[in-house]
Amino acid sequence: MSSEIIFLVLCGLALLGVAAATHFSGQGSLDNIKSKTVGDGQHGTARWATKEEIKKTYHLIPFQPEQWRKGEHLPQAQGLVLGCMGKKNKIAALVDTDDIHCLMIGASGVGKTAFFLYPNLEYACASGMSFLALDTKGDLARNYGAVASKYYGYQVAVIDLRNPTRSDGYNLLTLINHYMDVCRAEPKNLAARAKAEKYAKILAKTIVNQNGEGNYGQNQFFYDAAEGLLTAVILLLAEYLPPDQEHPEERRHIVSVFKLVQDLLAPDKIAKAKNSFQPLMDKLPDTHKARWFAGAALTSSDQAMASVMSTVLSRLNAFLDSELEQVLCFDSAMDAETFA
């Protein structure tokens, strides 16, 4: 053998010896890296949290879904499950009870749903939290909807936009109708009327300002007036079109709002007005809030009034769909107040 080959063999044996010594001595193991601050931060200050810090930051709660589903040892602390400690059958969940946001990012198949979302849904049910789940594939409704309803007594509502005919109802006017019904039964109940007006204003603003933008420049008047006019129409519909013996079904929904605005665009032959909205408002008492909300549109010119009503119709066009109406025209299984 030449001297070069012998030298290379010796170098290789030396490297193997160093690697073996490092491996068996444990010097290169991550387990031997201590959470010890080095220097004055010139090499960085990040480090792993100690067990004491973890216990101080998070609540360690035994994760026992088998017992929870029997109604036993239900957790009292509400929060997000961010991790776990322990071994099989003795797992303690790390629960953050602060008012925080959590973003889970991972590649396909890493367990975002099975190992993160499902444990959080189980814990939310056990601790009594209301939650909204965006379920584009339908897995959550199939896998955990029945669990939440059967074992924890939850009221589950599924809004299925893929198959609206099998979806639960979601009437946008549910709360407005409810509080307006209370007002009719108790005319002096100002709190109920105030809530009906509040929810009508919220709904109108959401429909008119769909992108959440409130600055329309020179057209700002038309959008503000459209918002007030839509609020007025919603309140009128909720107050004067309740179910009766002739029409026992609920007719107060967003499609009826569109139809009423469309009908009010027609000229009033009796009052000889270019639209029927002004004569309708004249029949209301001067102190009626619907008349106040529509004040900006009522005091404008006929051309501006037509533009305002056209703006309302254009915003309501998004709700005109035969399938979508199967969801929007039926009372909600739950409302925002029940959810909260």
Predicted features and spans:
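P-loop NTPase motor domains
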Residues: 74, 78-89, 93-340
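Basic- and hydrophobic-enriched, low-structure N-terminal and domain-boundary segments
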Residues: 1-110, 114-122, 127, 165
